[in-house]
Amino acid sequence: FLKAGKDILHITLSSGISGVINSAMIAKENLEERYPDRKILIVDSLGASSGYGLLMDKLADLRDEGKSLDEVFRYAEKHRLNVHHWFFSTDLTFYVKGGRISKTAGAIGGVLNICPLLNMDNQGRLIPRYKIRTKRKVIRTIVDKMAEYADHQTDYNGKCYISHSECYEDARAVADLVESRFPY
C-alpha cells in the first residue's frame, strides 16, 4: 500500500487482551522511515470478537461514504467505547484450567448452574461482572444490559452482532429476545 502511495489506517485488537498494538507501533516506526511522505494511523479498538467486527463494519461504511482517512480515524478514536461487549459461558471448565477459579469453585458453580457474565471495560480488558444462576437468566441479563446502553431503553437503531462458540441455540435465544425488545 505504502509503495503504491496509499496511507494506512490499522485497527488493532484490544491492548487489554493482546500485545498486537506494540507490534503495530514498531512496524509503523520502521515503515515511516522508509515512507516519510505516507501516513500510518493506528487505533487501539479496545474491543474483540464481534464488537471488534462491529466497529470495523462501521468504519468500512464511513470509508464507502467517502470519508477521509483522518475522518475515519477520528471516528474510531471517538466511538470505540460505544461498542459494548458482553460474554457468558455455561461451562466453567476453562476458567478452572486457566486458573481463574479453583476446582472447588468450578465444581460448585457447575452444580448451581452459574454462568459468569463478562464484558470489556474502558481499557479493553475482559472483566467478570456477574455470576448468574441459569442460562435463561444470563441471556435476559445480556439483553437488559443492551437496553441499559441503548437510547431511551428501547430505541436501538444500530447493528447488533451476536456470536457463539458451538452454542447456536443460546445465540438464537439472545437474538429472539433482542428482536422482541428492540423492534426494527
Predicted regions, residues:
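Mixed-charge interfacial surface used for oligomerization/domain docking
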Residues: G16-V20, A24-E29, Y35-L41, G47-D57, ...
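N-terminal glycine-rich phosphate/adenylate-binding segment common to multiple enzyme folds
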Residues: F1-I21
